[in-house]
Amino acid sequence: GMTKDELEKNLGTIARSGSLDFKTENQSDNIDIIGQFGVGFYSAFMVAKKVTVISRAQGADTAWKWESTGVEGYTLTEADKEDVGTEIILVLKDDTDTDKYSEYLEDYELANLVKKYSDYIRFPITMYREKSRQKPKPEDAGDDYKPEYETYTELETLNSMVPIWKRPKNEVKDEDYNEFYKNKFMDYTDPLRVITSRTEGTATYTALLFIPGSTPYDYYTKEYEKGLALYASGVMIMEKCADLLPDYFSFVKGVVDSEDLSLNISRETLQKDNQLKLMRNSLEKKIKNELHAMLNNDRAKYEEFWKEFGRQIKFGAYSDYGMHAELLRDLLLFWSAKEQKMVTLQEYIDKMPAEQKYIYFAAGDSTDRLAKLPSAELVLDKGFDVLLLTEDVDEFCLQILHSYPRKDAEGKDGTVEFKNVNSGDLGLESEEEKKAAEDATAENKALFDAMKDALNGKVKEVKVSTRLKDHPVCLSADGPLSIEMEKVLSKQPGSEGVKSDKVLELNVNHPVFAALKAAQEAGDTEKLNKYSTLLYAQAQLIEGLPVDDPAAYAEAVCSLMK
């Protein structure tokens, strides 16, 4: 209970100045106002047109009544109350077309509110609830007796009081965590991993986190809301606190409970709280360490996780200009053409031959097609592995990483760069082989210029290839924008004009090249143009690109078959 002075102090002061002023005026006391009677009390006026508080303190001779309509001050008068304690009486506002205040008179609505916001208050919150039960069957009831029911009231404790995250770990079974997760976060599947954390020191908190077993239906949409449920001493103050999680770990669900949040009245002040920032940094490290542990100790489960949320990790590495790339790079998985399984970048590095200069990759829409690319086959024939990237974000992720740590032959720290098998020099040829290709390109300059003119600006250059073995032709990209990146960017609004600088590469040892030379030497410009169109279209198809002009391509094929 409260005395007259305590009613005046706890309710009157806040009524005059507001909770933030109350905090400011009492900042020297270093008080925590969550749970203080009065703070949040005035939210009652959101639903009530009058609030009455009747209280009698322990050992006091008189009870006092505080009353206010929330408009102009309050009254404080003596009251009749024999027992010690406090009663709060709300006179609800009248219902309107938009607000139904009378719903707060329904016991299930009140019970739901308590369950949602105050389920873990340390003290029991009880309420008399009306229930129904079947009456005992009379002894003389006949065969046609129909069961009768009666209503009764029962005092029910609405809150759990001791949250699962504060119970000793040896008292909580996996099934308990799974049930809590499914009930709390409305998921029908068990979580993939449960993370518990208790941190004391600069930031003191208890956390119970879950990595879901499946991707939420709206996860990769703008409608998805990230965040952890934030509690202060068992009172939920925010259902989804987004500031506790970085975007790349936005799939994590759970609760965080802290007893020493420094300022926790509103979202605005909470978001600026240093304790919250410390908790976020600590949680981020904890989640990353748990993912590493899963990767190293339970690979099958990690690959399940990667299938569901790997894309988000890659987006995290790429976003913000690669600010978090180094933090996340060891969590990345890609398909290995040589190993025929998912591998980490470190696992790729560990199996690289000493003479290998790059981490090779190919990007496209399927691993089967990528493994058959002429340039990928060339790298694989050399005994080097190729990472096969099949998601839009993959190549952007590796581009932002640029390189990965690798010790040289002397054990000194160094790095090795990523290399698209369809871009630039692959570092596979000797200087003599490069010189021979350059000489062959110069020797056939007239032919290549005629082919470039026939393709009317579709390629930057036509040249002799050093990356073709059995295939007659391929496309490569000159510059930072690869052909696959062009495909991805072309899907974005306003990016229709983004083009990579394509190079048409020819195999001078293939019979098709002899046919090209013959058409040029015979002065058959029409045939040379058709050959050029066919070869460019063939190179497009190999790269998974749509043919620019399918009708012209079909006509060229048919005319050459006559």
Segments predicted by a language model, with ranges:
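GHKL (Bergerat-fold) ATPase N-terminal catalytic module, capturing the glycine-rich phosphate-binding loop
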Residues: 1-107, 112, 119, 135
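Conserved, well-folded catalytic cores of nucleic-acid-processing
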Residues: 10-21, 25, 47-57, 91, ...
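C-terminal interaction appendages of subunits in large macromolecular complexes
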Residues: 319, 323, 327-331, 346-562
